[in-house]
């Protein structure tokens, strides 16, 4: 069905109040958008950061009388008569099809493809991971996931054990298993990620070789030939004493979820235990890799 969108601009501190006003005026949903498209990379747990210049966008049923909506909003003390806003009609689309059309098979390195289930596999003889976008992070579209997949594709994983620390969708652990690893261990703080990883592993026929744990449940003596952690710079620094002990002597470590500007501080947290490689970059993100001394 078609919709009507009303957009107004405000400050981050007033956005929540105006969101409530839009809901009271009949909006079925309200979203916040940075006016200048500046991303927020790493909010603290439980924190919702808003930009200094924020667009508040309300979505209304197509039958809504928008003149009445505007008149109601003009009574709000933060808006007043003649407040600046933009109203536009959104065309009726098959939104599920529109969403699906944005995802295509993607190649990483020489052997590895990540394919959504509704697409044909481009190369049946390649290493193909079937993965659909879901609640947990990791489909290959983000530069950090792509950097990690390329790295895994370049390793000799035959018969190896891998730990995917912060496994999200399980994409890295599953890719490693499909690339020849004998065993993979996924760890995540989010139970939804554990379930998503389990479902994706079953879809790819590798569930019997994938172990999944919440941090409180993981074995104390975990060691692996390869450890990959695609999380964020802050946790990578804070958890360096833990993550750095997971690779065996001579084992490989791959870290991402790190902005290029954060690479030096993250690398510093691991350089005592690892011989580090040159940093790999993609867009504004990077990957730090090394071998356990």
UniProtKB/Swiss-Prot annotation:
Gene3D superfamilies, per database record: Vaccinia Virus protein VP39
UniProt xrefs under Pfam families: PrmA
Cited InterPro entries: Ribosomal_L11_MeTrfase_PrmA (IPR050078), Ribosomal_PrmA_MeTrfase (IPR004498), SAM-dependent_MTases_sf (IPR029063)
Subcellular location: Cytoplasm
Top-level enzyme category: transferase
Single GO term (MF): protein-lysine N-methyltransferase activity
Keywords: Cytoplasm, Methyltransferase, S-adenosyl-L-methionine, Transferase
Location (main, coarse): cytoplasm
Record keyword Chaperone present: no
Its EC number(s): 2.1.1.-
A cellular-component GO term for this protein: cytosol
UniProt binding sites for S-adenosyl-L-methionine: 145, 166, 188, 230
Catalytic reaction annotation: L-lysyl-[protein] + 3 S-adenosyl-L-methionine = N(6),N(6),N(6)-trimethyl-L-lysyl-[protein] + 3 S-adenosyl-L-homocysteine + 3 H(+)
A biological process term (GO) from this entry: methylation
Highest taxon of the lineage: Bacteria
Function description: Methylates ribosomal protein L11.
Family (UniProt): Belongs to the methyltransferase superfamily. PrmA family.
Family matches, as NCBIfam families: prmA (TIGR00406)
Name listed for the protein in its UniProt record: Ribosomal protein L11 methyltransferase
Taxonomic source organism: Serratia proteamaculans (strain 568)
Gene, per the UniProt record: prmA
């Amino acid at each position: 069905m078609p919709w009507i969108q009303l957009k107004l601009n405000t400050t981050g501190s007033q956005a929540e109040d105006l969101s409530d006003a839009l809901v009271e005026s009949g909006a079925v949903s309200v979203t916040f958008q940075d006016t200048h498209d500046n991303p927020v990379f790493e909010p603290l747990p439980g924190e919702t950061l808003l930009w200094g210049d924020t667009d508040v966008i309300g979505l209304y049923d197509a039958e809504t009388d928008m003149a009445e909506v505007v008149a109601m909003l003009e009574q709000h003390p933060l808006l007043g008569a003649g407040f600046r806003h933009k109203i536009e009609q959104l065309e009726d689309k098959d939104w599920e099809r529109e969403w699906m059309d944005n995802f295509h098979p993607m190649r990483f390195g020489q052997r590895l493809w990540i394919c959504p289930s509704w697409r044909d596999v481009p190369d049946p003889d390649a290493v193909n991971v079937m993965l659909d976008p879901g609640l947990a992070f990791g489909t290959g579209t983000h530069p950090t996931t792509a950097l990690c997949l390329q790295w895994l594709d370049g390793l000799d994983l035959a018969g190896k054990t891998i730990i995917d620390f912060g496994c999200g969708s399980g994409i890295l652990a599953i890719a490693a298993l499909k690339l020849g690893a004998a065993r993979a261990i996924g760890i995540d703080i989010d139970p939804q990620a554990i379930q998503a990883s389990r479902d994706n592993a079953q879809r790819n026929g590798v569930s019997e070789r994938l172990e999944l744990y919440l941090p409180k449940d993981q074995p104390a003596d975990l060691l692996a030939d390869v450890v990959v952690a695609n999380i964020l710079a802050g946790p990578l620094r804070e958890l360096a004493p833990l993550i750095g002990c997971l690779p065996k002597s001579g084992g490989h470590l791959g870290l991402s979820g790190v902005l290029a500007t954060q690479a030096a501080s993250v690398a510093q947290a691991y350089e005592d235990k690892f011989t580090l490689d040159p940093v790999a970059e993609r867009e504004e993100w990077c990957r730090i890799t090394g071998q356990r001394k």
